[in-house]
A protein has these predicted regions:
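Hydrophobic alpha-helical bundle cores within soluble ligand-binding/oligomerization subdomains
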Residues: 1-233
Length: 235
């Protein structure tokens, strides 16, 4: 028997996921059994977020409740906003997001509760507050005043408002909504693996998301998109 140690995880099935699947032979990506093409044609981003988190598309009442909850969790504390203002202006935005999620953990009343219900509450808070953190840093590093989130705008509309102090035409908002749907899930990738490795030690959800964001930053994962954008800007 060979004593050679095979390093890495190539060809090793670590676990399975029921959330998202890449189907190369069909050039398709599915979320909970729905193709992204179908979801982009028929759904808003909030509906897809509900689908990913809950396993099924919402009815009208479920969607209304989900949207109300998300909008109620958008605000960041004064402490976190002050911390964002103190962050270096040349910091990488992914490092800022990662740090903000860690700061959220320090304030979240459910941080030490790893029950499914508590994790769902924490997931909603992270989901709602992350765009606020992104926009706050974007404006702070440019020397502009931070714009508070609105409870009267959709997820995408609110992000534009916090970033640029205006909501663009519906076509642009819809295009951004579709981009969020396309980036919502991508099967059992390296950031998902990282998050699940962290939670396997019974660590908290914020820690898992922090690790996943650090992984996503890498040039062999989400960082590849950044490299493409920088190349396009250069060209």
């Amino acid at each position: 028997m060979s004593e050679e140690i095979k390093k890495g995880l190539l060809g090793i099935v670590v676990d399975e996921t029921t959330i998202s699947h890449v189907v190369p032979e069909l050039s398709a990506l599915t979320y909970r059994g729905y193709t992204v093409q179908e979801l982009c044609d028929k759904c808003d981003f909030e509906e897809v977020a509900y689908l990913v988190l809950n396993g099924e598309l919402p009815n009208k009442n479920q969607l209304k409740k989900f949207i109300k909850q998300e909008r109620s969790e958008r605000k960041l504390s004064k402490q976190i906003l002050n911390d964002i203002k103190k962050m270096p202006k040349n910091a990488h935005p992914m490092d800022v997001i990662r740090t903000c999620v860690s700061l959220m953990a320090l304030e979240d009343k459910d941080t030490k509760d790893n029950s499914p219900k508590a994790n769902m509450r924490k997931a909603m808070r992270i989901f709602a507050k992350t765009p606020t953190a992104v926009a706050a840093y974007f404006r702070s590093r440019k020397g502009k005043s931070i714009i508070s989130p609105s409870k009267n705008l959709s997820f995408s509309e609110n992000f534009f408002k916090m970033m640029f102090n205006k909501v663009p035409d519906k076509e642009i908002v819809r295009a951004f909504d579709i981009s969020l749907i396309l980036y919502a899930e991508h099967s059992f990738n390296v950031s998902t693996f990282t998050a699940r490795t962290i939670t396997s030690s019974l660590s908290d959800l914020h820690g898992a998301i922090t690790g996943a964001i650090a992984s996503l930053k890498g040039p062999l994962h989400g960082g590849a998109n950044e490299a493409v954008m920088l190349s396009l800007i250069h060209i």
